[in-house]
């Protein structure tokens, strides 16, 4: 692979360099790899550059060094190595499933990803989910310690799923993952916002920073003409509506007071929740053993996402 095909804005004298792979973990570096030195919360990749070189790295990308050649190793300065990692990963692993869905919010990401996965499976659609529970698809591919995977793992696994003709993939998008550019380079067909509460403020420091991290999904990572799904009852609905309007994203909302999918009746009978909702001027009834109104809303957002993935609403409710 030629560097100029992946980093067109780099110093001209380095454009014709070849590389064979990419890593940000020095232990995973092989011959002629690019090593991207990333400063994390616990480890600084710049401290492992020598290890990466011993393992075969020929190109080092870091925010700490100027462009130079030293001992036959190319050093390239980039302001945001995390962003470079995501963009390179996305370009190297070009093939991706057709329908990419991301779900973000403080609570409910895992539930929605699981509901969506189950709905599509029951409707005989090929589907996979990435998130807290690992990767689920045709089979369990691998587990992970992060809700949102690193960009190389995302790229490799999306490429794998596309080859297996799995066309629908839902990813949990954490605020950490969004702020750290792990999903940069991807464009989503459907984005889901669950809710926001005071969490992870050890990392984000302020609620505003936490919200802005979540909103990266809708501001920067959605396709034109894509679909945003969120709760009309949340106090952040107006912010999301404005973002959708500005970025030409179609919005579909759920809610008890307002919403495209409107909850009209809700009751608990014999430890089951029963509700009536309307959508597209038609009423539907739903019974579920899920507990709590929050889970009902998570389920309804999953139903909307499945419907926008070309499954008829009647078929979804039968499943």
Regions from the PLM with identified roles:
Residues 89-135, 140:
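Walker A (P-loop) phosphate-binding motif
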Residues 3, 62, 66-72, 162-167, ...:
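Acidic, Mg2+-coordinating active-site environments of NTP-dependent enzymes
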Residues 1-87, 91, 235, 262-265, ...:
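N-terminal leader/targeting and accessory segments in enzymes
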Residues 13-22, 83-86, 149-152, 156, ...:
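Short gly/ser/thr-rich secondary-structure transition/capping motifs
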Residues 131-153, 157:
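P-loop NTPase switch/communication element
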Residues 75-77, 100, 127-129, 191, ...:
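Conserved beta-strand scaffold positions in the cores of enzyme catalytic domains, especially
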């Amino acid at each position: 692979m030629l560097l100029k095909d992946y980093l067109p804005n780099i110093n001209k004298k380095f454009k014709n360099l070849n590389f064979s792979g990419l890593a940000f973990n020095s232990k995973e570096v092989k011959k002629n790899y690019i090593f991207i030195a990333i400063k994390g919360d616990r480890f600084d990749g710049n401290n492992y550059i020598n290890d990466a070189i011993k393992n075969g790295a020929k190109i080092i990308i870091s925010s700490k060094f100027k462009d130079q050649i030293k001992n036959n190793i190319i050093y390239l300065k980039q302001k945001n190595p995390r962003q470079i990692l995501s963009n390179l990963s996305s370009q190297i692993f070009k093939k991706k499933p057709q329908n990419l869905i991301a779900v973000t919010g403080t609570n409910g990401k895992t539930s929605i990803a699981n509901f969506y996965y189950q709905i599509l499976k029951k409707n005989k659609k090929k589907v996979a989910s990435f998130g807290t529970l690992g990767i689920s698809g045709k089979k369990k591919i691998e587990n992970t310690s992060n809700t949102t995977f690193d960009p190389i793992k995302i790229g490799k696994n999306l490429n794998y799923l596309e080859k297996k003709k799995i066309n629908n993939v839902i990813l949990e998008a954490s605020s950490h993952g969004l702020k750290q550019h792990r999903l940069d380079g991807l464009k989503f067909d459907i984005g889901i916002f669950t809710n926001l509460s005071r969490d992870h403020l050890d990392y984000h420091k302020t609620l505003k920073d936490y919200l802005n991290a979540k909103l990266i999904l809708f501001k920067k990572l959605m396709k034109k003409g894509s679909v945003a799904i969120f709760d009309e009852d949340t106090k952040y609905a107006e912010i999301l509506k404005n973002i959708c309007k500005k970025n030409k994203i179609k919005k579909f909302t759920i809610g008890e007071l307002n919403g495209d999918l409107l909850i009209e009746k809700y009751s608990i009978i014999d430890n089951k929740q029963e509700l009536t909702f309307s959508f597209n001027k038609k009423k539907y009834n739903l019974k579920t053993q899920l507990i709590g109104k929050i889970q009902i809303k998570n389920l309804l957002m999953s139903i909307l996402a499945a419907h926008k993935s070309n499954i008829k609403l009647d078929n979804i409710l039968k499943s």
